[in-house]
A protein has these predicted regions:
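Short acidic/glycine-enriched loop/turn segments that link adjacent beta-strands
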Residues: 41-44, 98-102
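Conserved short submotifs of the Hanks-type protein kinase catalytic core
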Residues: 101-112
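Juxta-kinase regulatory segment immediately upstream of eukaryotic protein kinase catalytic domains
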Residues: 1-35
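A conserved alpha-helical element in kinase catalytic cores
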Residues: 57-99, 115-131
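Hydrophobic/aromatic-rich alpha-helical bundle segments in the mid-to-C-terminal region
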Residues: 143-144, 282-295
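Active-site activation/catalytic loop segments of kinase-like enzymes and analogous catalytic loops
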Residues: 229-258, 268-286
């Protein structure tokens, strides 16, 4: 669940058109001496550390403007440009929309993806989630859609299974409880309203643990407004995958300690159904591990949900 095998078949620095690389160097004020493609993630766009001739490092993301993921990249750079300086995220230095390519240059953040099975690293992640809730409430981007508007049509996997023939390989517990899962899933939006700017895609490979112990949150491509507890609950299956008592964690964390357990179960149910449905779709050709990740997430979340609900 920690994203170590999540790498897509990324575009490389030398695959960018000469004119795009030249413009990046011009705007950066130095030549690129070396480029290192960064691991992790499911997007096939360029994501690389650039070592500049003047000794500075920057981080570049880029994608063809006609690519199916270009809108996601545009959302990310527009969001990054509007995040407050107090948010634990790399600063966007500049962006380019030039000769058919969308480019974003960020501050380079040294570090590694946090390992959720290491108590100190998990503690840093949990502290950062508390910081996000405090810093991003109310949302500094009030014009964003709500989580119900963005995700309501997507988080209906159990309903679709119930209305059609469920997949033959669906586990016995989910098959027996399919109607109840669809009913619980349908209630998650009742609890999710709020005015916090949410990331909605927190995973270890979307975070970096810096040498000073602070966490930088990356890849703001799916922002929306909703309840402050959503991001922690969305990350919690990745924590549960390490055998950690995630129910106890949610009961004691400041962001979730006062939240109705029914609300948590409803959102977990919706996540499990989403992953169960998406994992059975054909794999994107340049992100072959995505469906495997979703299948693992579905199993972990469904198992945890079964223990919570005691059905």
């Amino acid at each position: 669940m920690d994203g170590n095998d999540n790498s897509a078949n990324r575009i490389r620095w030398n695959e960018l058109p000469d004119v795009v690389r030249a413009e990046i160097e011009h705007r950066s004020g130095a030549r690129v001496r070396a480029a290192t493609t960064q691991p992790g993630g499911f997007s096939h766009g360029l994501a690389a550390r650039l070592e500049l001739s003047d000794g500075r490092d920057v981080f570049v993301k880029a994608i063809d403007s006609d690519d199916s993921l270009a809108a996601m990249y545009r959302t990310e750079l527009e969001t990054a440009a509007r995040l407050p300086s107090t948010a634990p995220a790399p600063a966007l230095r500049f962006s380019l929309d030039t000769p058919g390519w969308l480019v974003a240059i960020f501050d380079y953040v040294p570090g590694h993806h946090p390992r959720l099975d290491r108590p100190a690293e998990l503690a840093a992640v949990l502290s950062t989630i508390e910081q996000l809730a405090a810093t991003l409430t109310p949302s500094p981007l009030p014009d964003l859609p709500t989580i119900a508007q963005d995700y309501g049509p997507q988080l209906q996997g159990w309903r679709r299974f119930a209305e059609h023939q469920p997949p033959a390989d669906l586990d016995d517990w989910s098959r027996r409880n399919l109607d109840k899962l669809a009913e619980l899933e349908s209630t998650w939006t009742d609890h999710a309203a709020g005015e916090t700017l949410l990331h909605t895609d927190l995973r270890p490979d979307n975070m970096l643990l810096r040498p000073d112990g602070a966490i930088a949150v990356l890849d703001w491509a799916w922002p929306c407004r909703g309840a402050a507890w959503i991001d922690l609950v969305a990350l919690s299956p990745a924590i549960a995958a390490h055998g950690i008592d995630t129910d106890r964690l949610l009961a004691t964390h400041p962001v979730t300690s006062d939240i109705d357990p029914v609300a948590v179960s409803a959102f977990l149910c919706a996540l499990a159904g989403y992953w169960a449905a998406k994992s059975r779709e054909p794999a994107p050709p340049r992100s072959p591990s995505l469906r495997r990740y979703q299948a693992r997430s579905a199993r972990v979340t469904t198992d945890w949900l079964g223990r919570r609900l005691r059905w």
